Amino acid sequence: KPEPVAIGKARVITEGETLAIVSIGTMLATCEEVIARLSKKGANCTLVDARFAKPIDTDLLDRLCKTHSALLIVEEGAAGGFAAQVMQYLVNAGHMDSNVKVRAATLPDSVIDHAERDFQLETVGLDATSLLQQAESLISDNINMANSAHS
């Protein structure tokens, strides 16, 4: 049965505790692939479908910053978009003063050569492999500890 969508409320796809990936728009399927690949490496991650560029779900962002060591915001948009709104909120709410690492994976603020979408995303680092590398760099200590435990 379909549930009503609350305006400004994100949807948590998977719940974890190390890294939270907050995706908006067309990047959700790619982020699901990244989460699956991280899980195989022993990382327990959260995936959020932001659903709304405005208003942003500040309650969820507050919770994620308190319960996760890192946050990766992913959007197929450029400077001044959703990721910028989230970062501004995190700064103003004091979350950037805490121990949470925050990164944004977005399109560059430049012209992208005409090509197939997958090639363009790979070129700008928004493909699954590039996002996986960014995520791993944020939580490398956690992945190394998980791999040691399985050895």
Positions of predicted regions on the chain:
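Thiamine diphosphate
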Residues: 1-151
